[in-house]
Regions:
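Formylglycine-dependent sulfatase
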Residues: 1-100
Length: 100
């Protein structure tokens, strides 16, 4: 997942100068969205929705640094069950739920 990336900064969407060959290759083999939306204008809750497949108010992470509840399954949990190694790189504005 690439986030914080403007659609009009990709050559597959017609940027006249920037070249993004790897993302263009993924777009050619997959799906290009012409209209999409996020669950929250705040990045942390929006990422939590991507991770869980749930709306902001159903998973409870309503602001940056508000953790997902312990036991909340994410895409990483499901991928690991299939033997796929996962990791997170970069800022996520997510924290572990230390209080449980």
């Amino acid at each position: 997942m690439a986030d914080q990336l403007r659609w009009d900064y990709l050559s597959c969407y017609g940027h006249p100068h920037l070249k993004t060959p790897h993302i263009d290759s993924l777009a050619k083999k997959g799906i290009q969205f012409e209209s999409a939306f996020v669950q929250s204008p705040v990045c942390g809750p929006s990422r939590a929705s991507y991770y869980t497949g749930r709306t902001v108010f159903s998973h409870g992470s309503t602001w940056n640094q508000v953790p997902l509840p312990i036991g909340e399954l994410t895409i990483g949990d499901y991928l690991r069950q299939s033997g796929i190694r996962t990791g997170v790189v970069g800022k996520t504005h997510m924290r572990p739920d230390l209080e449980g």
